[in-house]
Amino acid sequence: MVQSCSAYGCKNRYHKDKNISFHKFPLARPDVCGKWVAAMRRNNFKPTRYSNICSQHFTKDCFKPECNNRVLKENAVPSLFCFSKLQIKAESLADPFPPEMDFPLTLPSLPLSDTEETQQEIQTETHHTVDPLPLVENLPHSMSISCDHNYTVEDTVQQKKRIEQLEEQLDKLRKKLKTVQQKCRRQERQLKRFKAIGEFQRVNRDPALGEGYVILPKQLYDALKGIEPVEGP
């Protein structure tokens, strides 16, 4: 699987000729991992063991100099990101009301003569306060989510293509292995025949005939007796 950067808008991918290193999220240290995710400003992003951030998002003091600036320090946090105005605006509008704000839901106990005036004041204040809420429906942060989805689809297509290539290579290797095994079995059978012939000749050799003679089976003799001998020069 080709390593790619998970930072928003970053298209860096691993290449042996590029002087860019990729660093996995410190999932074993939730406190540091949380700082990484917060620094990225990607909505609904959850890192996995396959998620990476490239070295271009870290300052020089984040690396260990004795490791050729390829190994991060334990508490290193990425800080070099390029955020668009739309993304920053979406984050600022994502939570228009701070958590400590509270709207009164019940009217205080007042004399009957002051109730109508108090209700009008509360309705006026509530109307002016809640008026900006419809803007939330058109927040541009959906653009960021769409881009994240495109990254995921692109990675999935590349993974599928890589799996198909590996399966094709595996199929070729299996066919090659089968051919070699068949060849080995043929050679083993041929070797057994040669050994059997040699053993037969050793057992059935007649000492009286000398070293130049052997006793052959009748079928082999009938097949060879019609062949003319080759005369010497």
UniProtKB/Swiss-Prot annotation:
Residues 152-197 form a coiled coil. Gene3D superfamilies: THAP domain (6.20.210.20). This is THAP domain-containing protein 1. Keywords: Cell cycle, Coiled coil, DNA-binding, Metal-binding, Nucleus, Transcription, Transcription regulation, Zinc, Zinc-finger. It holds the Pfam family THAP. One of its GO terms (cellular component) is nucleoplasm. SUPFAM superfamilies: Glucocorticoid receptor-like (DNA-binding domain). It is found in: Nucleus, Nucleoplasm. InterPro entries: THAP1/10, THAP_Znf, THAP_Znf_sf. One of its GO terms (biological process) is regulation of transcription by RNA polymerase II. A zinc finger (THAP-type) spans 5-57. Belongs to the THAP1 family. One of its GO terms (molecular function) is RNA polymerase II cis-regulatory region sequence-specific DNA binding. PANTHER family: SI:DKEY-228B2.6-RELATED (PTHR46600:SF7), THAP DOMAIN-CONTAINING (PTHR46600). The gene is thap1. DNA-binding transcription regulator that regulates endothelial cell proliferation and G1/S cell-cycle progression. Specifically binds the 5'-[AT]NTNN[GT]GGCA[AGT]-3' core DNA sequence and acts by modulating expression of pRB-E2F cell-cycle target genes.
